[in-house]
Amino acid sequence: MEHIRTTKVEQVKLLDRFSTNNKSLTGTLYLTATHLLFIDAQQKETWILHHHIASVEKLALTTSGCPLVIQCKNFRIVHFIVPRERDCHDIYNSLLQLSKQAKYEDLYAFSYNPKQNDTERRNGWQLIDLAAEYERMGVPNANWQLSDANREYKVCETYPRELYVPRTASRPVIVGSSNFRSKGRLPVLSYCRQGTEAAICRCSQPLSGFSARCLEDEHLLQAISKANPGNRYMYVVDTRPKLNAIANRAAGKGYENEDNYSNIRFQFVGIENIHVMRSSLQKLLEVNGSKGLSVNDFYSGLESSGWLRHIKAVLDAAIFLAKAIVVENASVLVHCSDGWDRTSQVCSLGSLLLDSYYRTMKGFMVLIEKDWISFGHKFSERCGHLDGDPREVSPVFTQFLECVWHLTQQFPQAFEFNEAFLLQIHEHIHSCQFGNFLGNCQKEREELRLKEKTYSLWPFLLDDKKKYLNPLYSSKSQRLTVLEPNTASFNFKFWRNMYHQFDRTLHPRQSVLSIIMNMNEQSKQLEEDIKDLEAKIKQCKNGILTKELLHAVHPESPALKTSLCLKEPSLLPVKDTLRAIEGSSPADNRYCDYAEEFSKSEPTVVSLEYGVARMTC
């Protein structure tokens, strides 16, 4: 509280940033230890968590007051007009301090108290068991074993304690390979496909330079290849552009020399580094925040940002992994520079395409814990949790979530969770409300004692499971083991509900999923009414349903009233302003064709015609 100079300011205006006539709401601004709160004259509340604030800008004084612009990491932008410059200056300085903490213990997670006891807290952290996940894959087995070489984090500080390696890999081979890899991140198992033994492994770039080699590293890659008896070769996928990898050779790093490694096939996939991605997102946000752009100007700005091209590059790399494993039955080793950014993206998305379990709500949590949290994606640096180097901030995990969202658009029946689930996870990688995403590796999290001092996000999401369920999800999709998305350019869309989720005045739309969920609720109510009517009919000796008996069955039921009037109503009346429903075009909603090994895109699910939602085949 020592950073808060002014706790309350009245007559503050909240501007609508897309209004052409400076439309605004007048209310009171409150500053607390954790949130900035605005309450307008109608008692509507706008809460902004301090940790969500990316930047605060105090503009030049105007005749109506002092402007204060706040940009948030969850893409909310708020524009306040504070009547007095002194109050604006106090709030500005307070937010600069409160939004950038110097140490982890000052983050919200360490003071957040959801009224759970220690047992509930412990059970929440035990919800995800990675040892059980590897057992689900059939590991350990005849070819793969659990190694204790990193039990004390002596081999690699940014890897988990438990590493799965080929059974033929000895401890000297593991240690030697670690010494030859950047940050000690040696090749280890990420995913094993049951029934074929083809595997996804991950590591960092080798310290090969132009001519250096390491026999232990060569032996480890050979052991990974032999752990898959179904194929005599394996792929090594370098996720960087080739020029970047060549440049790293001059610094004593680089990529594997195929002459030194037997039975490997090398592949570059060309995903740009964190600095390019950060710049691309900034360009995208500049386009999003511009007022009065024409449609052509918006699409031109979206194209020049390069954001969707980067999303496509990440998905293409994941598709390469899936095809190598399914079509060629080949194992794949993935790396970038240090193996915690692009490597996490590609390994997790490849696993998602291959394994339907990861497309369930619980499985998706397991996937994030396995390929992102346990393998040391630097969440705190990439999300700017602390006041650190801004050059380390990059939307790597945001890109992963956006790739998943694009998959849900092409395969709406294949995912148990909906868009709101992805948005909520994105909200909490920045909120610092839960301990899951704090720190940069498992060792650091253990030192912070996060499981004792903070709470896990996952049980809270599962408690609200109904809110995040996808009404289109089909259990039949569990039989579909592999997704093959189409990455033609027309399949990539601007994720409006991510980047404009707080701009309610900007072309308001009702989502197709919301419509279908409402239709499901109506159907359930009608089924209950039918059961009650059937029970009442049985009680009638002559089988005649009297008017009094009708009113005894849910007299207030809108569905029943409609049925009794013998009208042919619309399933869901939609106002003219809601006819433009996102995802209602043929390119937006697709079913899956399960007749083939890889699924394909399918025809429209829901269309709107004359204000009526209809199912189409």
UniProtKB/Swiss-Prot annotation:
Q: What class of enzyme is it?
A: hydrolase
Q: Localized where?
A: Cytoplasm; Endoplasmic reticulum-Golgi intermediate compartment; Cell projection, Ruffle membrane; Endoplasmic reticulum
Q: Which residues carry this modification: Phosphotyrosine?
A: 108
Q: Which Gene3D superfamilies match?
A: Pleckstrin-homology domain (PH domain)/Phosphotyrosine-binding domain (PTB)
Q: Identify the keywords attached in UniProt to this record, alphabetized.
A: Cell membrane, Cell projection, Cytoplasm, Endocytosis, Endoplasmic reticulum, Hydrolase, Lipid metabolism, Membrane, Phosphoprotein
Phosphoserine occurs at which residues? 557, 585, 607
Write down the InterPro entries for this protein, in alphabetical order: MTMR6_PH-GRAM, Myotubularin, Myotubularin-like_Pase_dom, PH-like_dom_sf, Prot-tyrosine_phosphatase-like, Tyr_Pase_AS, Tyr_Pase_cat
Q: Where is the GRAM domain?
A: 1-101
> Could you say which residues bind a 1,2-diacyl-sn-glycero-3-phospho-(1D-myo-inositol-3-phosphate) here?
248, 273-274, 337-342, 382
Q: What biological processes does GO assign it?
A: endocytosis; phosphatidylinositol dephosphorylation
Its Enzyme Commission number(s) read 3.1.3.95
Q: Where is the active site?
A: 336
Presence of keyword Endoplasmic reticulum: yes
The tissues where this chain's protein is expressed are given as:
Isoform 1: Ubiquitously expressed including in heart, brain, spleen, lung, liver, muscle, kidney and testis (at protein level). Isoform 2: Expressed in testis (at protein level).
Partners and quaternary state?
A: Homodimer. Heterodimer (via C-terminus) with MTMR9 (via C-terminus). Interacts with ALKBH4. Interacts with KCNN4. Interacts (via GRAM domain) with RAB1B (in GDP-bound form); the interaction regulates MTMR6 recruitment to the endoplasmic reticulum-Golgi intermediate compartment.
Q: Which family does it belong to?
A: Belongs to the protein-tyrosine phosphatase family. Non-receptor class myotubularin subfamily.
Entry comment, domain topic: The GRAM domain is required for cell membrane localization.
Q: What is this protein called?
A: Phosphatidylinositol-3,5-bisphosphate 3-phosphatase MTMR6
Task: Give the originating organism.
Answer: Mus musculus (Mouse)
